[in-house]
Amino acid sequence: IRERVVDILSNLPANDTFDWVDEVSVELTARMLATLFDFPYEDRRKLIHWSDITTDTPELTGAEILDPEQRKADLMDCAGTFMGLWQDRVARPPKFDLISMMAHGKDTQNMTENPMLFLGNILLLIVGGNDTTRNSISGGVLALNEFPAQHRLLMDRPELIPNMVSEMIRWQTPVIHMRRRALADQRLGDELIRAGEKVVMWYLSGNRDESVFPEADRLMIDRPNARSHVAFGFGIHRCMGNRLAEMQLRVLWEEIHKRYEHIEVVGAAERNPNNFIRGIKSLPVRLHHRR
């Protein structure tokens, strides 16, 4: 992770304005996803595209209108590509990439017998590995510009970076909500949730709960209970890649702290018009290097 972070940061424009989302957030995420899947490195941006068209579903999320036929064709391209990778892994000894582990795993080796189940699981892994990390990286830069006192605190106390990572994830909350179906009757407070009913969990609302997080709309990098956020879900549905996401963010901010006095946001952030993914499409910045 550090090797990839250093390479990305070392090749950023020194004195020009550039888009932080494309040059850093997306690029780091694409490189890490390609590594996890042992996906052809030169095609890594396809992973980001497939993730974007999976979550940009206008009828469900309010996102921008996409050409439905093109979207379908692109998702079939995704399915075909990963089917090819799967068949390649089946023919080889087990390795440590996710495709190989699933292809040789007792509980997952027959997944391709149901093509839609296979595609659904692949897209779940791609989206899960893309959106949380990518938008927390972008949101963190934006937050430190909105709350300059917190940026000064970071400069003075870099040991706060691990806690800051949790606070940035809480503040950004990249996945806004998730829906589950109750398997049994369950009483929650004064409400009875019956088996078969659908329950929507608003992670963004939970992470702004003033009874848990005082001044919840503020970024506070020394917040004592920052790790109590629910951005990764909870219980058996907690994101299995949460430690990797935190590690990527921690390493990135450690390397940023070594190099830059400030990452200045110099224009308006373009947000993703979506009620499922709380994303940032572009963020113009200029770097101020340490002297």
Predicted segment positions?
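Cytochrome P450
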Residues: 1-291
